[in-house]
Amino acid sequence: ANTQEKIVQARSHVVQIKFLDAVRAVAKNKLFWVISLAGWIGFLESTYGNMLQWCYQYHNTKEDGVGAGLYTIITMVVANANLWGMLAAPFCIKKWGKKAVLIFTNALNAVILFLLYPVVQAEPPKMIVYIAIILFGNYLMSSFGVILTPAVNADIRDYQQYLTGERIDGMFSTVGLIGTVITLLTSGLVPAVYEKVGINENTLSSRASEISAITGKSISEVMNSPYNVLYINDIFKKAFVVIVILSVIGATLNFIPYFFYDMTELRQRAIVKVLKLRAMFEDYGNGVLNDKDIVDAIDVIEEAQSMKNAKPKDIDSFKKAVKSADGKAAKKQAKKALKDAIAYNENIEISKMVNEEVEKFDREEW
Protein backbone atom coordinates (compact mmCIF):
# COMPACT_ATOMS: atom_id res chain seq x y z
CA ALA A 1 0.00 0.00 0.00
CA ASN A 2 1.13 3.56 -0.68
CA THR A 3 1.35 4.61 2.97
CA GLN A 4 3.96 6.61 4.84
CA GLU A 5 4.94 6.54 8.50
CA LYS A 6 4.16 9.92 10.05
CA ILE A 7 6.08 9.44 13.29
CA VAL A 8 9.38 11.33 13.05
CA GLN A 9 12.10 9.32 14.77
CA ALA A 10 15.71 8.38 14.11
CA ARG A 11 16.09 4.94 12.53
CA SER A 12 18.79 4.10 15.04
CA HIS A 13 16.83 5.34 18.06
CA VAL A 14 16.23 3.05 21.01
CA VAL A 15 13.74 4.28 23.59
CA GLN A 16 15.49 4.63 26.93
CA ILE A 17 13.26 6.10 29.59
CA LYS A 18 12.13 4.78 32.95
CA PHE A 19 8.46 4.03 33.50
CA LEU A 20 7.98 6.62 36.24
CA ASP A 21 9.92 9.24 34.28
CA ALA A 22 7.61 8.64 31.32
CA VAL A 23 4.51 8.96 33.49
CA ARG A 24 5.82 12.20 34.99
CA ALA A 25 6.63 13.56 31.53
CA VAL A 26 3.09 12.92 30.27
CA ALA A 27 1.64 14.34 33.50
CA LYS A 28 3.40 17.64 32.68
CA ASN A 29 1.92 17.80 29.18
CA LYS A 30 -0.63 20.63 29.38
CA LEU A 31 -2.26 19.78 26.06
CA PHE A 32 -2.98 16.23 27.22
CA TRP A 33 -4.82 17.52 30.28
CA VAL A 34 -6.80 20.06 28.26
CA ILE A 35 -8.18 17.39 25.94
CA SER A 36 -8.74 14.89 28.76
CA LEU A 37 -10.51 17.46 30.92
CA ALA A 38 -12.85 18.39 28.08
CA GLY A 39 -14.02 14.78 27.92
CA TRP A 40 -14.24 14.22 31.66
CA ILE A 41 -16.31 17.28 32.55
CA GLY A 42 -18.50 17.01 29.46
CA PHE A 43 -19.95 13.60 30.34
CA LEU A 44 -23.41 15.13 30.94
CA GLU A 45 -23.69 16.07 27.26
CA SER A 46 -24.60 12.50 26.26
CA THR A 47 -27.64 12.51 28.58
CA TYR A 48 -29.85 13.27 25.56
CA GLY A 49 -28.96 9.90 24.03
CA ASN A 50 -32.31 8.25 24.86
CA MET A 51 -34.58 11.11 23.81
CA LEU A 52 -35.65 9.79 20.41
CA GLN A 53 -36.29 6.27 21.63
CA TRP A 54 -38.15 7.45 24.75
CA CYS A 55 -40.23 9.91 22.74
CA TYR A 56 -41.27 7.16 20.33
CA GLN A 57 -41.97 4.59 23.05
CA TYR A 58 -43.62 6.71 25.73
CA HIS A 59 -44.98 9.81 23.96
CA ASN A 60 -46.25 8.46 20.67
CA THR A 61 -50.04 8.62 20.50
CA LYS A 62 -52.08 7.72 17.43
CA GLU A 63 -53.25 11.32 17.07
CA ASP A 64 -49.88 13.08 16.96
CA GLY A 65 -47.26 10.32 16.90
CA VAL A 66 -45.36 8.51 14.13
CA GLY A 67 -45.48 4.94 12.88
CA ALA A 68 -42.73 2.35 13.07
CA GLY A 69 -41.72 2.94 9.45
CA LEU A 70 -41.32 6.69 9.86
CA TYR A 71 -39.46 6.21 13.15
CA THR A 72 -36.98 3.91 11.39
CA ILE A 73 -36.41 6.56 8.71
CA ILE A 74 -36.01 9.27 11.36
CA THR A 75 -33.35 7.33 13.29
CA MET A 76 -31.54 6.47 10.05
CA VAL A 77 -31.47 10.10 8.87
CA VAL A 78 -30.29 11.38 12.27
CA ALA A 79 -27.51 8.78 12.43
CA ASN A 80 -26.50 9.68 8.86
CA ALA A 81 -25.56 13.18 10.07
CA ASN A 82 -22.27 11.66 11.26
CA LEU A 83 -21.18 11.10 7.66
CA TRP A 84 -21.47 14.75 6.63
CA GLY A 85 -19.57 16.00 9.65
CA MET A 86 -16.70 13.61 8.99
CA LEU A 87 -16.57 14.65 5.32
CA ALA A 88 -16.58 18.37 6.16
CA ALA A 89 -14.06 18.17 9.03
CA PRO A 90 -10.81 17.99 6.97
CA PHE A 91 -11.78 21.05 4.90
CA CYS A 92 -12.78 23.05 7.99
CA ILE A 93 -9.56 22.09 9.79
CA LYS A 94 -7.49 23.17 6.79
CA LYS A 95 -9.25 26.53 6.59
CA TRP A 96 -9.62 27.47 10.28
CA GLY A 97 -7.38 25.11 12.27
CA LYS A 98 -8.16 22.42 14.83
CA LYS A 99 -8.61 24.72 17.83
CA ALA A 100 -11.12 27.00 16.10
CA VAL A 101 -13.12 24.03 14.78
CA LEU A 102 -13.07 22.35 18.21
CA ILE A 103 -14.40 25.46 19.95
CA PHE A 104 -16.96 26.33 17.26
CA THR A 105 -18.47 22.86 16.86
CA ASN A 106 -18.68 22.23 20.61
CA ALA A 107 -20.10 25.70 21.35
CA LEU A 108 -22.64 25.32 18.55
CA ASN A 109 -23.53 21.92 19.99
CA ALA A 110 -24.52 23.59 23.27
CA VAL A 111 -26.71 26.07 21.39
CA ILE A 112 -28.33 23.30 19.33
CA LEU A 113 -29.09 21.21 22.41
CA PHE A 114 -30.64 24.26 24.09
CA LEU A 115 -33.16 24.41 21.23
CA LEU A 116 -34.64 21.20 22.64
CA TYR A 117 -35.88 23.11 25.70
CA PRO A 118 -38.68 25.15 24.04
CA VAL A 119 -39.72 22.08 22.03
CA VAL A 120 -40.07 19.94 25.16
CA GLN A 121 -41.91 22.73 26.98
CA ALA A 122 -44.36 23.28 24.11
CA GLU A 123 -44.91 19.56 23.36
CA PRO A 124 -46.03 20.19 19.76
CA PRO A 125 -47.81 17.48 17.72
CA LYS A 126 -45.31 14.96 16.35
CA MET A 127 -42.72 16.28 18.80
CA ILE A 128 -40.34 13.48 17.83
CA VAL A 129 -39.86 15.10 14.40
CA TYR A 130 -38.73 18.40 15.97
CA ILE A 131 -36.41 16.56 18.33
CA ALA A 132 -34.98 14.58 15.41
CA ILE A 133 -34.23 17.75 13.43
CA ILE A 134 -32.39 19.27 16.39
CA LEU A 135 -30.48 16.06 17.13
CA PHE A 136 -29.45 15.88 13.46
CA GLY A 137 -27.59 19.15 14.02
CA ASN A 138 -26.12 17.79 17.24
CA TYR A 139 -24.89 14.61 15.56
CA LEU A 140 -23.48 16.69 12.71
CA MET A 141 -21.40 18.82 15.07
CA SER A 142 -20.37 15.87 17.26
CA SER A 143 -19.13 13.89 14.25
CA PHE A 144 -16.37 16.45 13.68
CA GLY A 145 -14.79 14.93 16.76
CA VAL A 146 -14.29 11.63 14.94
CA ILE A 147 -11.69 13.38 12.78
CA LEU A 148 -10.52 15.99 15.27
CA THR A 149 -9.80 13.67 18.21
CA PRO A 150 -7.13 11.47 16.55
CA ALA A 151 -5.64 14.51 14.80
CA VAL A 152 -5.32 16.42 18.08
CA ASN A 153 -3.95 13.37 19.89
CA ALA A 154 -1.28 12.97 17.20
CA ASP A 155 -0.24 16.62 17.68
CA ILE A 156 -0.08 16.12 21.45
CA ARG A 157 2.24 13.13 21.02
CA ASP A 158 4.49 15.08 18.66
CA TYR A 159 4.61 17.85 21.26
CA GLN A 160 5.51 15.29 23.96
CA GLN A 161 8.34 13.98 21.80
CA TYR A 162 9.52 17.56 21.24
CA LEU A 163 9.64 18.15 25.01
CA THR A 164 11.24 14.89 26.14
CA GLY A 165 13.00 13.52 23.06
CA GLU A 166 11.14 10.22 23.45
CA ARG A 167 8.07 8.79 21.78
CA ILE A 168 6.13 7.53 24.82
CA ASP A 169 2.64 7.14 23.35
CA GLY A 170 1.78 4.20 25.59
CA MET A 171 2.10 6.35 28.70
CA PHE A 172 -0.85 8.48 27.64
CA SER A 173 -3.12 5.49 28.14
CA THR A 174 -1.55 4.80 31.53
CA VAL A 175 -2.03 8.34 32.82
CA GLY A 176 -5.44 8.39 31.14
CA LEU A 177 -6.59 5.67 33.55
CA ILE A 178 -7.39 8.56 35.87
CA GLY A 179 -10.36 9.09 33.58
CA THR A 180 -11.64 5.62 34.45
CA VAL A 181 -11.81 6.61 38.12
CA ILE A 182 -13.61 9.84 37.23
CA THR A 183 -16.07 7.89 35.06
CA LEU A 184 -16.81 5.54 37.96
CA LEU A 185 -17.38 8.48 40.29
CA THR A 186 -19.72 10.28 37.88
CA SER A 187 -21.55 7.29 36.37
CA GLY A 188 -24.17 7.30 39.13
CA LEU A 189 -25.13 10.97 38.71
CA VAL A 190 -27.54 10.64 35.78
CA PRO A 191 -29.39 7.58 37.20
CA ALA A 192 -29.72 9.49 40.49
CA VAL A 193 -31.27 12.43 38.64
CA TYR A 194 -33.66 10.08 36.83
CA GLU A 195 -34.76 8.66 40.16
CA LYS A 196 -35.24 12.15 41.55
CA VAL A 197 -37.62 13.17 38.73
CA GLY A 198 -39.79 10.11 39.32
CA ILE A 199 -38.26 7.23 37.37
CA ASN A 200 -38.20 4.87 40.34
CA GLU A 201 -40.01 1.89 41.84
CA ASN A 202 -41.99 3.95 44.37
CA THR A 203 -43.53 6.19 41.71
CA LEU A 204 -44.19 3.16 39.53
CA SER A 205 -46.04 1.38 42.34
CA SER A 206 -48.12 4.39 43.34
CA ARG A 207 -49.18 5.23 39.77
CA ALA A 208 -49.31 1.77 38.21
CA SER A 209 -53.08 1.86 37.73
CA GLU A 210 -52.81 5.22 35.93
CA ILE A 211 -50.16 3.81 33.60
CA SER A 212 -52.31 0.73 33.00
CA ALA A 213 -55.24 2.94 32.00
CA ILE A 214 -53.05 4.93 29.58
CA THR A 215 -51.37 1.95 27.93
CA GLY A 216 -53.92 -0.83 28.28
CA LYS A 217 -51.24 -3.04 29.82
CA SER A 218 -51.82 -5.23 32.84
CA ILE A 219 -50.45 -4.17 36.22
CA SER A 220 -47.86 -6.95 36.08
CA GLU A 221 -46.66 -5.71 32.68
CA VAL A 222 -46.51 -2.14 33.94
CA MET A 223 -44.40 -3.18 36.93
CA ASN A 224 -41.71 -4.72 34.69
CA SER A 225 -39.75 -1.47 34.36
CA PRO A 226 -39.62 1.81 36.32
CA TYR A 227 -39.24 3.60 32.98
CA ASN A 228 -42.94 2.90 32.37
CA VAL A 229 -43.65 5.98 34.50
CA LEU A 230 -42.68 7.96 31.39
CA TYR A 231 -46.11 7.11 29.96
CA ILE A 232 -47.41 9.68 32.47
CA ASN A 233 -47.12 13.05 30.75
CA ASP A 234 -46.06 15.19 33.72
CA ILE A 235 -43.19 12.80 34.57
CA PHE A 236 -42.23 12.49 30.90
CA LYS A 237 -42.07 16.27 30.51
CA LYS A 238 -40.15 16.77 33.76
CA ALA A 239 -37.63 14.08 32.78
CA PHE A 240 -37.10 15.56 29.31
CA VAL A 241 -36.62 19.09 30.68
CA VAL A 242 -33.97 17.79 33.09
CA ILE A 243 -32.29 15.80 30.29
CA VAL A 244 -32.07 18.92 28.12
CA ILE A 245 -30.64 21.02 30.97
CA LEU A 246 -28.02 18.38 31.83
CA SER A 247 -27.05 18.01 28.16
CA VAL A 248 -26.62 21.76 27.70
CA ILE A 249 -24.53 22.01 30.88
CA GLY A 250 -22.36 19.10 29.69
CA ALA A 251 -21.92 20.57 26.21
CA THR A 252 -20.98 23.97 27.68
CA LEU A 253 -18.44 22.47 30.08
CA ASN A 254 -17.05 20.39 27.23
CA PHE A 255 -15.84 23.26 25.05
CA ILE A 256 -14.44 25.58 27.75
CA PRO A 257 -11.09 23.71 28.15
CA TYR A 258 -10.39 24.05 24.41
CA PHE A 259 -9.69 27.77 24.90
CA PHE A 260 -6.48 26.67 26.67
CA TYR A 261 -5.38 24.43 23.79
CA ASP A 262 -2.52 26.46 22.28
CA MET A 263 -1.09 24.06 19.69
CA THR A 264 -1.53 25.76 16.33
CA GLU A 265 -1.01 24.17 12.92
CA LEU A 266 1.97 26.46 12.42
CA ARG A 267 3.61 25.41 15.67
CA GLN A 268 2.97 21.75 14.93
CA ARG A 269 4.65 22.06 11.52
CA ALA A 270 7.65 23.71 13.19
CA ILE A 271 7.83 20.93 15.78
CA VAL A 272 7.86 18.28 13.05
CA LYS A 273 10.77 20.05 11.32
CA VAL A 274 12.68 20.22 14.61
CA LEU A 275 12.03 16.52 15.21
CA LYS A 276 13.38 15.74 11.73
CA LEU A 277 16.57 17.65 12.52
CA ARG A 278 16.99 15.82 15.82
CA ALA A 279 16.48 12.48 14.08
CA MET A 280 19.11 13.42 11.49
CA PHE A 281 21.66 14.40 14.15
CA GLU A 282 21.04 11.19 16.08
CA ASP A 283 21.41 9.00 12.99
CA TYR A 284 24.55 10.94 12.06
CA GLY A 285 26.03 10.23 15.48
CA ASN A 286 25.21 6.54 15.10
CA GLY A 287 26.63 6.35 11.57
CA VAL A 288 23.41 5.38 9.80
CA LEU A 289 22.64 8.62 7.99
CA ASN A 290 21.89 8.39 4.26
CA ASP A 291 22.28 11.02 1.55
CA LYS A 292 18.58 11.86 1.40
CA ASP A 293 18.48 12.63 5.13
CA ILE A 294 21.50 14.93 4.76
CA VAL A 295 19.95 16.80 1.83
CA ASP A 296 16.61 17.20 3.66
CA ALA A 297 18.32 18.48 6.82
CA ILE A 298 20.47 20.95 4.89
CA ASP A 299 17.37 22.25 3.08
CA VAL A 300 15.54 22.78 6.38
CA ILE A 301 18.50 24.57 7.99
CA GLU A 302 19.28 26.74 4.95
CA GLU A 303 15.65 27.76 4.57
CA ALA A 304 15.47 28.69 8.26
CA GLN A 305 18.71 30.67 8.09
CA SER A 306 17.57 32.54 4.99
CA MET A 307 14.39 33.62 6.81
CA LYS A 308 16.21 34.67 9.98
CA ASN A 309 16.10 38.41 9.31
CA ALA A 310 13.11 38.37 6.98
CA LYS A 311 10.31 40.84 7.61
CA PRO A 312 6.68 39.66 7.53
CA LYS A 313 4.63 40.87 4.60
CA ASP A 314 1.61 43.10 5.12
CA ILE A 315 -1.28 40.68 4.60
CA ASP A 316 -3.90 43.44 4.75
CA SER A 317 -2.44 45.13 1.68
CA PHE A 318 -2.64 41.86 -0.25
CA LYS A 319 -6.28 41.40 0.83
CA LYS A 320 -7.07 44.92 -0.38
CA ALA A 321 -5.38 44.09 -3.69
CA VAL A 322 -7.70 41.08 -4.09
CA LYS A 323 -10.78 43.25 -3.47
CA SER A 324 -9.65 45.99 -5.84
CA ALA A 325 -8.48 43.62 -8.61
CA ASP A 326 -10.35 44.24 -11.86
CA GLY A 327 -11.07 41.22 -14.00
CA LYS A 328 -10.95 37.48 -13.45
CA ALA A 329 -7.26 37.07 -14.32
CA ALA A 330 -6.17 39.97 -12.12
CA LYS A 331 -8.20 38.68 -9.17
CA LYS A 332 -6.76 35.20 -9.60
CA GLN A 333 -3.23 36.62 -9.62
CA ALA A 334 -3.97 38.76 -6.54
CA LYS A 335 -5.31 35.72 -4.67
CA LYS A 336 -2.17 33.77 -5.53
CA ALA A 337 -0.02 36.65 -4.26
CA LEU A 338 -2.04 36.69 -1.02
CA LYS A 339 -1.62 32.95 -0.59
CA ASP A 340 2.14 33.22 -1.20
CA ALA A 341 2.42 36.09 1.31
CA ILE A 342 0.63 34.07 3.99
CA ALA A 343 2.92 31.09 3.33
CA TYR A 344 5.95 33.41 3.48
CA ASN A 345 4.93 34.77 6.89
CA GLU A 346 4.25 31.26 8.15
CA ASN A 347 7.72 30.15 7.09
CA ILE A 348 9.21 33.03 9.07
CA GLU A 349 7.48 31.79 12.23
CA ILE A 350 8.48 28.17 11.58
CA SER A 351 12.08 29.22 10.95
CA LYS A 352 12.28 30.82 14.40
CA MET A 353 11.82 27.43 16.09
CA VAL A 354 14.19 25.71 13.67
CA ASN A 355 16.91 28.34 14.19
CA GLU A 356 16.44 28.12 17.95
CA GLU A 357 16.99 24.36 17.75
CA VAL A 358 20.12 24.68 15.60
CA GLU A 359 21.62 27.55 17.57
CA LYS A 360 21.12 25.92 20.95
CA PHE A 361 24.39 24.03 20.34
CA ASP A 362 26.22 27.38 20.49
CA ARG A 363 25.09 28.01 24.06
CA GLU A 364 27.32 27.47 27.06
CA GLU A 365 25.38 24.44 28.35
CA TRP A 366 26.36 22.57 25.18
Name each model-derived stretch.
Residues 289-324, 335:
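Acidic, Ser/Thr-rich low-complexity segments on the non-lumenal side of membrane proteins
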Residues 1-289, 293, 319, 326, ...:
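Membrane-embedded alpha-helical bundles of multi-pass transporters/translocases
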